[in-house]
Each structure stands twice: as C-alpha cells, then as structure tokens.
Amino acid sequence: MVIKAQSPAGFAEEYIIESIWNNRFPPGTILPAERELSELIGVTRTTLREVLQRLARDGWLTIQHGKPTKVNNFWETSGLNILETLARLDHESVPQLIDNLLSVRTNISTIFIRTAFRQHPDKAQEVLATANEVADHADAFAELDYNIFRGLAFASGNPIYGLILNGMKGLYTRIGRHYFANPEARSLALGFYHKLSALCSEGAHDQVYETVRRYGHESGEIWHRMQKNLPGDLAIQGR
C-alpha cells in the first residue's frame, strides 16, 4: 500500500479507504477498536475520530453509537463525491469509470436541456452565450463545458440535476482538461454549443435529444482514441 497523504488525517483516511478497497476491512465487517486502529495507523485517537466521522458522511462506514463501527458496501451507500477516490484506487478501471460517467451525463442532459429550453429559454441562452468568449485552450474549455452542462441543468428548474453535476465536478473537470487538449474536441464542442443555441432560439425542443446523443457519440469516439495516453493525475491527490 503506497499512501501519499500530506497530513496525519489524510494518511488515516487513505489508509482506511484503501484497506476497505483491498478487502483488508471487507464490507459488512467491523473496524478494529479505536485504540487498536489509531496505533495501527499511527495517529491520535482524536484525529482518527474526525476521520471516521468524515468517512461515515461519505458512506464508507456506519458509526453505531455504543457498537463497533461497520464497514459499508460503498457502492450502495456512497454518492458521486467518491468518484475521484475510486479513480485513484483503481487506475486500470478509470477508462470504464469515465465511460460510465459520460454516459450518465449524456442520458440525463437529454432531459434537462430539453426542459430548460421549454421552460426557461432565456436562462438557457444566457448559459450557452458564454461559449462565444472562451479562450482556445484546454483549461478554459474544461471549465466552460462543465459550466454549460451545469448551467443548463439548473435552468431546467429542477435543482436535482444541478446537484448531480456538482457531484461529478472533480473528475469531470480533470477529464475535460485532458480531453480538450485536443483541438478536434474543442471544435466539436463549440459546434455543439452553437447548435443547441440555435435549437433553443427556434423552439426546436424535439431535436435536442438527437443532438445531445450525437454529440455524446462523436465526443466519445475522440475520447476513446485518446484513452491510451490517459494521464495518471486524473485521480485526486492525497490530503
């Protein structure tokens, strides 16, 4: 186990998460007693307590007052906030994780973009207009792309879509910085944003689904060609 945390709390958090991932602390079992675990990791019990509370909030553990702390099946109990952690834990599975993430984005955006155009076209156009002033480099496009999808999610009037995008932000923007380093990807995205703007202006809500699906397919093809050069820094760094 190689841990690169920058603080005792960060080290303890990574130690426990990696132990759960590697089945040293399997789901459904209980953690060692607090004193034993603090000595094992090499941190104070106060630090360990804070870490356990944070991991419980993220769904890794269930703290049962008066009972031992239980290890959860994190796939069933955690939220989107652990995406970056999963990418760090299993780099070989990152391409599949990203494919799943982008598939979810495409599927839900066909719904919330169409709703935004129907119910709040002025807000949607305001969001899409930000594409007219983007600088032609990867970081700017990564930020723009995330903000456009997130902005349209909130423009739909259903904030839950926006919260889903919030949960994707960390890994999503890391992917974007790599993906948008490709000029072809930037060109395709601009064409997509402008097409959406035209559909919104025309009230052509029925064309949103096919437009978004086509963009998902075409951008996916570019992404798959780039995956062989996937950088290792897509995963979150130690604390």
From Swiss-Prot:
Gene Ontology cellular-component terms listed: cytosol
Induction: By growth in the presence of long chain fatty acids (C14-C18).
Occurrences of domain HTH gntR-type (ranges): 6-74
Subunit (UniProt): Homodimer. Binding of acyl-CoA alters conformation of the dimer, separating the DNA-binding regions and disrupting DNA-binding.
Outcome, altering residue 216 to A: Super-repressor, non-inducible phenotype, cells cannot use long chain fatty acids as carbon source
Effect caused by changing residue 219 to N: Super-repressor, non-inducible phenotype, cells cannot use long chain fatty acids as carbon source. Protein has 10-fold decreased affinity for C18:1-CoA, can still bind fabA DNA and alter transcription
Residues annotated as binding CoA: 99, 103-107, 213, 219
Protein name per the record: Fatty acid metabolism regulator protein
InterPro entries listed in its UniProt record: FA-response_TF_FadR, FadR_C, TF_FadR/GntR_C, Tscrpt_reg_HTH_GntR, WH-like_DNA-bd_sf, WH_DNA-bd_sf
Described purpose of this protein according to its UniProt entry: Multifunctional regulator of fatty acid metabolism. Represses transcription of at least eight genes required for fatty acid transport and beta-oxidation including fadA, fadB, fadD, fadL and fadE. Activates transcription of at least three genes required for unsaturated fatty acid biosynthesis: fabA, fabB and iclR, the gene encoding the transcriptional regulator of the aceBAK operon encoding the glyoxylate shunt enzymes.
Region (Binds acyl-CoA): 215-230
Effect of substituting residue 215 to A: Loss of FadR repression
Gene: fadR
Species whose genome carries this gene: Escherichia coli (strain K12)
Keyword Cytoplasm: yes
Keywords, in A-Z order: Activator, Cytoplasm, DNA-binding, Fatty acid metabolism, Lipid metabolism, Repressor, Transcription, Transcription regulation
